[in-house]
Amino acid sequence: MSRFLRNAALAALTMAAAGAFASAASAQTYSRLVVFGDSLSDNGNLFAATGGASPTSPPYFQGRFSNGPAFTELLGFNAGRSAAGASVTGSINYAYGGARTDSSAFPPGMRNQLLAYTGAGGTFRSTDLVSILGGANNIFQGLPAAGASPNPTGAIAPVVSAAAADMNFLVNSIAAAGAGTILVGNIPSLGNAPQFRGTVAAPLAEFAGTSFNSALLAGLMTTAAARPGTNIILFDIYKVGAALTANPGAFGLTNVTDACFNGITVCATPNTYLFWDGVHPTAAGHQLIARLANDYLYYGDIGAQSTVQAETAFRQREDLLDLASEGMSGRADWQAGTHLTFGAIADSVETDARGS
């Protein structure tokens, strides 16, 4: 039966619930990782393609759009870059900084990333884990014109709709091709990113991001119902960011509003910042994102133990963030997820390519 897992910020996690569900967990296993996306997932593809020109490294870390590895490099696989002639039988990363969700030529849009993978002989298996994350660059590039129009929200709406449609096309195509598990990230709060925070563009950026997330979710629910052989996991990065911003100290952070790297100088304590630059997380931020992603990927079936109202199950438990030194005070912000099955239905104003 198809499973659609959606992170959700449910209130009041209790230790009793955590213990009850933790004992019922059964770990998931995957044979390899295939990645499609933009700078949040890029492990150095754009850097290699531009001859080391973008992003500037250092201060960026070895071609990543951060000061350390991207979260996709922390999911238990050593995925290779998508250079010409690269093997597509093992783990591989096709994400490019600056990529849109469409068929843009360069950086390769995500539709083109998928075409490049399948064109090289790449296939999808029931044991594969596929990560898909994108949409922000479409919005970044659409904001200037939309902001200058008489109806900014109306002008940005087609950009948002097209990006969400691209994402859902990718998910549906990959599921139809046989992928067992697809991790689909939505986009974080754009209005609260340093690039937009406090600017006149912030409200429109936030509107665009949240509208995209809503459209993405609606499409994924339809796709999950139509693709019973694939587990589709919506990784709610928006709510991850909200949890970190609401209680930064619980996660070892002291600054969740400013960029550590301002384009000239790097802050003294990058590991205490959430943002590396105007829109990208620090290595510490990527590590926190990866910890929660791993929790859902490897223990994502816990919700099945608690069915509530027809085909909906709610999961309340402690996420394994390995933050014991921080105590329990902030962990509830990470907790919970909503697990949906479909038996009842079916039986920021620049691209990240330049390093900001």
Name the predicted role of every residue range.
Residues 32-47, 71-74, 90-96, 128-134, ...:
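Structural recognition of the beta-strand scaffold that forms the well-ordered cores
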Residues 74, 78-79, 123, 169-183, ...:
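A structural motif corresponding to the C-terminal end of an alpha-helix
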Residues 143-146, 196-199, 351-355:
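Outer-membrane beta-barrel translocator domains and adjoining extracellular loop/strand segments
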Residues 1-27:
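Gram-negative bacterial Sec-dependent N-terminal signal peptides
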Residues 189, 194-207, 211, 218-222, ...:
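Mobile gating loops/cap/lid regions near enzyme active sites that modulate substrate access
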Residues 27-29, 84-88, 121-126, 130, ...:
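Extracellular/periplasmic catalytic domains that process cell-envelope and extracellular macromolecules
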Residues 56-165, 313-317:
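Conserved SGNH/GDSL esterase-like catalytic core that processes O-acyl groups on lipids
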Residues 26-28, 45, 78-86, 115-124, ...:
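Secretion/assembly modules of Gram-negative surface proteins
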